[in-house]
Structures are given as C-alpha cells and as structure tokens.
Amino acid sequence: MQIFRADLLEGQICVVSGAGTGLGRATAVELASLGATVIGCGRRPEPIADTVAMIREVGGTAECEAMDIRDDEAVDALFDGVIERHGRVDVLVNNAGGQFMSPAEAITPKGFRTVIELNVQGTWQMTHAAATKAFIPQRAGKVVSVTLSPHRGMPGMVHSGAARAAVENMMRTLSIEWARFNVKLCAIAAGQFDTEVIRTKYPREVSENVARTIPLQRLGMPEEMAWMIAYLASPAGDFLSGCVITIDGARDNWFGPWPPPGATGESGEPLAEERRKPDA
C-alpha cells in the first residue's frame, strides 16, 4: 500500500539501525521507496544484506553496514563513512535494541548491564555521533528512536522498561538542548507488531492471545510503524520534536481486568457481565 507521494523523501540520506528484520526492515524499505538513500546497519550482516537487496530489487538505493551500536569506534566509522560518501546525514532512526524476559530477582548484573548498554548507551552513541558529525554542523537533522509502549510497567522486563524510559527522556531533553541547531528528536513507543520474530519464535496461540489484549483486537503491521517514521522524516514532521508517539492499538491506555475493551464473544457482541435481574 502506497500512503505517501513517491518522491516525498527524494535525496534524503537516512541511517536506520536494526534494519535487518521486523520494524527496522519495514522502515528501511519504506524510506527507500519514497526516494531516500538508506544506510541500514545491524550486528548480523546477512539480514542487513537481505534488506538492502529487497530495496534494490524494486529500484531503491541502499547500503549495508555490519556493526555494533555499542562499539563507539564502529559508530564513528559508520557516520564518517556516510558523510564521506554522501556529504551529510538527514535522518537517524534508532531501531536497534533488545531484551530478554526474566523475573526481576533472577536478572544478573551482567544481564541488566547488557540491556542498558544496547538500548541506552547504543542509542546515545548513534545519536551523539549523528549530531556532532552531521546535524549540528549542517544545522538540520532528525532523530526517531523506537521504544516500547507499556509505560505502566511490564513484569519480566524491568531492565527493558528502565532502558526505554531513559531513551524517551533522552529524546525529550535533547529536543530542548539541540533546538538551537534545528535538530528535531522524537520517540515512538511501539506496541505488539506482526513481525517475523513473533511469527517464528512463538506458537500461533501466543500472537492470538496478545492480540486479544489490544483494544483494536489485532497486532500492528510493521508498515504502520514505517509510515509514522516516514511522516516524521518528511516536511510534515518539521514542527514535531520532543514528543513520544505511542503506536499500539490503544493497548497502553488499558490496564484494567480482563476482558479488554473491544473483546467480543462468539456472537460478536461485546463481552459483558451476567447480572441478576431485579425481582419483579
């Protein structure tokens, strides 16, 4: 489905981390389809190369960089190379991240530190390098960082919750501090999306049960995340900075007992409590 004009991002240079799978791949493909040159990066070279091949097959322009966002020298080399080849960077999408589910009491110092380094330190290093090497000198640039939508706590994910909250506040703070350089920064709090990870890592029943906890009663499509990022990257997003946009089918607004709003029974009618009729 084509939402935007085909040349919306014509000539823009966009760096997308975690571009090898899921939301990152969908974002890279969408930005390239709108005319941007996409530099996709990630730790595993094969998935990144596959994304680049997909883009090139449909006539887009893309490059792949295998690197770890936690490695500050690799981050510097990434942006130095992009600027040497293209002269500038217009958009950075911080999509790379990761976590594992575990009871809080079972998380080791190493496990907690790893999640913080990947999600917070890595995001900071990518953002700082993009800003100091490109955005601040050219007095223009945009950063979109992908986080998670459960803002009221998610059991088993204390390390990830702490990390994602840090990234959101990082974007808010930098949006004020770097406004004088015309650098705009936003975060997108992502809910549950129908990516290859959820399709291949878990039984189908898991995704179905997850969808039932979403008021809109479905998982998001990766393209729906990509469309929002494309909007922010476009001139339409020029006055958006310092905000956290939640894309999760209203899941973050619901925290009450089962069933969630929107759930229906076999008849298709909304579920409701059977109440005793008053005596006649």
Residue ranges and their predicted role:
Residues 13, 20-22:
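Conserved glycine-rich cofactor-binding loop
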Residues 169, 180, 187, 208-240, ...:
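C-terminal helical subdomain
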Residues 36-50:
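Conserved glycine-rich Rossmann-like NAD(P)H-binding loop of the short-chain dehydrogenase/reductase
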Residues 144-167, 171-180, 192:
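Catalytic loop of short-chain dehydrogenase/reductase
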Residues 103-104, 108-116, 210:
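Substrate-binding pocket helix/loop in short-chain dehydrogenase/reductase
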Residues 1-4, 241-280:
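Short C-terminal tail/terminal secondary-structure segment
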Residues 132-136, 176-180, 238:
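Alpha-helical segment proximal to the catalytic Tyr-Lys
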